[in-house]
Amino acid sequence: GGGTGQPLDWYEYDLMENPYQQLVVWNPDAEEILGGYRYILGDEVEFDKHGKPVLATAHMFNFSEKFLKEYLPTTVELGRSFVTLEYQSTRAGSKGLFALDNLWDGLGALTVIKSNVKYFFGKMTMYPSYNRFGRDMILFFLKKHFSDKDGLITPMVPLEIETDPAILEKLFCYDTFKEDYKVLNTEVRKLGYNIPPLVNAYMSLSPTMRMFGTAIN
């Protein structure tokens, strides 16, 4: 999962007057935490004196008036997510298979409790150590199939794709998500990498997902 890497993972947005909340997945039998999400409800977001939303992503992205007025009130911003080491599939075996599903169940429960929620918004992290060509393929693929044509949210300092666009256009030349995804999965694996789990998960969850660009955090 994401986080600061420090023994205590909190920051200013956990301590402000109207802080982010924590969705926690709990195993009642073992009495232990499986994972969690940091989140804030859009209709509870406050604005600073410049009219800018007080959000963890506000230092990286510009939010259009259309997004702030028409989308934010029915949106949940998702922050750091994690699955505890004991429940990560590489070391947990069968009990780790459903940890991520349990997180989705928690988000689903949140939409039942807060019936006005229509959208989830947040960032997915790709670390600098990830293969650059692999990263460029993923970004190109996401932009092709999930682009934000309305300009709802834009990165302040966009991270540009370094690979020649002609190479990527030749690779991802199909009309459907499914066919292009096969290419993406195959080519990334050739590099000795996997598509990051959350990227895979979000793409599979919703065909109406939008990708708002890439920024350096």
Task: Describe these PLM feature segments.
Residues 1-41:
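Short amphipathic alpha-helix that is part of the acyltransferase structural core
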Residues 44-214:
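Acyl-donor binding region in acyl/amide transferases
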Residues 3-10, 207-216:
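Short, well-structured beta-strand/strand-turn elements
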Residues 15-24, 47-48, 209-210, 217:
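A short helix-loop-beta-strand connector motif used in the catalytic cores of GNAT acetyltransferases and
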